[in-house]
C-alpha cells in the first residue's frame, strides 16, 4: 500500500513538473504578444544592419555580403532539420509542437527570448570561431532574416488567403504536412530539402 502511494506521488510529481515546464515555455500567447515577435525580429534585423553599415570597415563589405547570403542559404537546411528532427522527434519540443498541430490557428509561437537565444548560441557564437566579427555577424544576420521569412510564411499559410500561386503552393504542402501524420513536407519556406531527402508529398 505504501509502495502504491509512493508511485502515485511520483506520477503526480512528474505531471506537475511537466506542467511547470509548459508554463515556463508558454507557447500560446495573446494576439498582441504573438505579433510582437515579428516586430522584435524586424527591429533586431534593422539594428544589426545599421551597426554593420555604420561600423564595418570598407574592406570587409564583400565578406559581409557573402556571409549574409550564406546565412540566408543556410536557413532552409536549419529550418528543415529543426522541424523534422527536433520538433517531431525530440521531447519536450515534440510535445510543444504537437500543440500547434492540434490547434493550428491558435496563436502559438516560440518565445522570442528563446528563439533569439538559440540563434545567438548556435549561430553567432560558433561563427565567431572564424575569428572575424563581421563575418560572424553577417552570417547571423542572414540566418535571422531567414527565420523571419519562415515565421511570416508559416503565419501566412495558416491565416492568409492564398491568392498568389507561390503562397497557395506553400499552404497546400503545409496542409498535407498537418494532415498526413506529419511525416512529410517539413520545409515551410521551400521544399528544396524535402526534395533532397525524399520527404516531399503532393
Residue ranges and their predicted role:
Residues 1-147, 152, 163, 180-202:
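Non-catalytic, topology-defining segments of multipass membrane proteins
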Residues 157-170:
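Interfacial helix-loop-helix junctions of multi-pass membrane proteins
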Amino acid at each position: 500500500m505504501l509502495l502504491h502511494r509512493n508511485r502515485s506521488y511520483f506520477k503526480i510529481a512528474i505531471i506537475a513538473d511537466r506542467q511547470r515546464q509548459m508554463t515556463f515555455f508558454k507557447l500560446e500567447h495573446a494576439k498582441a504578444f504573438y505579433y510582437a515577435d515579428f516586430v522584435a525580429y524586424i527591429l533586431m534585423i534593422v539594428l544589426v544592419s545599421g551597426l554593420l553599415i555604420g561600423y564595418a570597415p570598407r574592406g570587409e563589405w564583400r565578406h559581409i555580403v557573402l556571409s549574409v547570403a550564406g546565412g540566408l542559404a543556410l536557413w532552409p537546411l536549419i529550418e528543415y532539420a529543426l522541424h523534422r528532427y527536433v520538433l517531431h522527434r525530440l521531447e519536450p519540443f515534440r510535445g510543444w509542437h504537437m500543440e500547434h498541430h492540434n490547434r493550428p490557428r491558435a496563436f502559438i509561437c516560440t518565445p522570442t527570448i528563446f528563439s533569439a537565444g538559440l540563434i545567438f548560441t548556435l549561430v553567432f557564437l560558433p561563427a565567431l570561431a572564424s575569428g572575424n566579427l563581421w563575418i560572424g555577424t553577417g552570417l547571423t544576420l542572414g540566418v535571422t532574416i531567414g527565420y523571419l521569412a519562415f515565421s511570416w510564411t508559416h503565419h501566412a499559410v495558416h491565416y492568409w488567403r492564398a491568392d498568389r500561386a507561390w503562397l497557395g503552393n506553400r499552404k497546400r504542402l503545409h496542409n498535407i504536412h498537418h494532415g498526413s501524420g506529419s511525416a512529410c513536407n517539413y520545409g515551410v519556406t521551400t521544399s528544396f530539402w524535402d526534395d533532397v531527402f525524399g520527404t516531399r508529398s503532393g
